[in-house]
Design a protein with these regions (language model features):
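Membrane-anchoring hydrophobic helices of lipid-metabolizing enzymes
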Residues: 1-113, 118-119, 155-160
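Short, contiguous strand/loop micro-motifs
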Residues: 37, 109-110, 166-167, 206-209, ...
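Short glycine-/small-residue-rich flexible loop motifs, especially phosphate/cofactor-binding loops
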Residues: 50-51, 123, 160, 221, ...
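Short catalytic/ligand-binding loop motif for oxyanion handling, primarily in non-cytosolic enzymes
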Residues: 82, 86, 119-121, 143-145, ...
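Short acidic-hydrophobic, aromatic-tinged amphipathic segments that line or gate anion-handling sites
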Residues: 95-100, 166-174
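Generic preference for hydrophobic
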Residues: 98, 135-136, 249
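Non-catalytic C-terminal accessory region of glycerolipid acyltransferases
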Residues: 103-105, 128, 132, 172-291
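Catalytic core of membrane glycerolipid acyltransferases/transacylases, capturing the structured
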Residues: 107-172
Length: 291
């Protein structure tokens, strides 16, 4: 065990974002904005994100990108503690602006979101709208969490909380398609992200992304087609001045539309251009373009 790595994990995953559990959100954001100036925070994550983002986008203010990346990570990690210690219904009403509406409860859907901005509040909103959904997830490893045992424990806690928030067991590979079909057959939803590395799935397909030939996983669309479930694309962005989230819910889409993955890629690109520092998977972005 490397004590320095454990201390870093304690600070980055628990102590600092945990401030949101004890302070009002307005005060927490004021603290987070000051902490985000600290270049030591979320190293080497933010330098790697900046280096990769610069290969695909024009980053005019690198210092601002780095600061906003750190701030977004603080907010995303804080959402775990807000989920534990705040009423999600009251918090959504006060701090999350919802644009659009979910399909009526009882209508089976496949939800598509991205690792751009915090992910918990879309899941909370969907659950409160009457939809229980199984989330496609991946296991955390100690290596993926900074080689720290505390980081790994945090990741496990986050997955367990996500399962509680969504209302259904998480879906891990192998057997993703079969498990997802069982959920849809039982009138539950399935939600996941199409921006994970394409090489981890057999269902990647070509798209245009950032004006380049690319590929994105199409497993969620395949799940929707097999289950004849409508597809809803949604995302959560953050006003970094106030910490207020904006949850945008798209209109239901036909899973058999041949242009559906292109539509997903278009929304993904829009988010990357609007708030590139909010994307937490820049370290994997090169894999989209290995076509």
């Amino acid at each position: 065990m490397d004590l320095r790595l454990e201390v870093r994990a304690l600070v980055e995953y628990i102590a600092l974002p945990g401030i949101a559990a004890v302070l009002p959100w307005r005060w927490s954001m004021a603290v987070f904005r000051r902490l985000a100036r600290w270049q030591w925070l979320y190293q080497p994550e933010w330098p790697g994100a900046l280096a990769t983002a610069k290969r695909y986008l024009a980053i005019d203010d690198e210092a601002a990108f780095a600061r906003d990346f750190r701030l977004t990570r603080l907010i995303d990690h804080a959402d775990l503690y807000l989920t534990w210690f705040r009423s999600r219904r009251r918090y959504l009403a006060r701090h999350v602006e919802v644009r659009g509406t979910w399909p009526a409860a009882g209508q089976v859907l496949v939800g598509v979101f991205f690792h751009v901005g915090p992910g918990f509040w879309g899941v909370h909103s969907l659950r409160l709208a009457g939809h229980s959904s199984a989330v496609l997830a991946g296991h955390y490893s100690r290596r993926s969490m900074g080689d720290a045992y505390l980081g790994w424990y945090y990741g496990v806690a986050r997955l367990k909380t996500l399962q509680w928030a969504s209302g259904r067991p998480l879906i891990f590979s192998p057997g993703t398609l079969a498990k997802a079909q069982q959920e849809l057959d039982a009138q539950h939803g399935v939600i996941g992200t199409p921006d994970v590395p394409p090489e981890i799935t057999r269902y990647s397909q070509p798209v245009q992304l950032l004006h380049r030939p690319a590929q994105l996983p199409a497993g969620l669309i395949e799940i929707a087609r097999r289950g004849n479930a409508q597809v809803v694309i949604y995302d959560t962005q953050v006003d970094l001045a106030t910490g207020r989230r904006v949850l945008s819910i798209g209109a239901p889409l036909d899973p058999n539309d041949q242009a559906l993955l292109a539509h997903v890629a278009e929304r993904f690109e829009t988010l990357l251009r609007e708030q590139p520092s909010a994307f937490s998977l820049w370290s994997f972005a090169d894999s989209y373009f290995r076509v």
